[in-house]
Amino acid sequence: MSGFAVLTLVLTSTSFTAGGAIPSAHTCEGADRAPALAWSGVPAGTKSFALIVDDPDAPDPKAPQTTWVHWVLYDLPATASALPAGVTVATLPAGAREGRNDWGTTGWRGPCPPIGRHRYVFKLYALDLSLPLLATPDKAHLEQAMQGHVLAQTQLIGTYEKKHK
């Protein structure tokens, strides 16, 4: 199939490198600002994006380990290719919506692990539709709404360990 470019959805950050430490400015030990994110390799037919950020290393008193959700975004417009550092609901691209994190609030809540170094997985999904208005969905409800509509997905992982216990 020569002459055709194969696009692969890629997510990057100027705030941290893939697999590297997330700077304190983006955590509970700093200003707790969302990191800068950018993406490329968007597949044809993309109508919107969704972003979920979670910590698969979170301890839970009821279980040895659980996944803790830090950020839920959806209906990022297909024309968007980046989010600047410190983006808030007021500065999101027009039409973008926030879901509920595991603190029960909306918006970015940065790393704040109680013990050890944790991984933070930034998952970006290219969707073939703009999702209907959802009532501040959590991760599970957003994933359910996206089912059957994901054209491509990618992830970027950063790590963090609290400096002050």
What do the predicted segments below correspond to?
Residues 2-165:
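N-terminus-centered regions that define maturation/targeting leaders and the start
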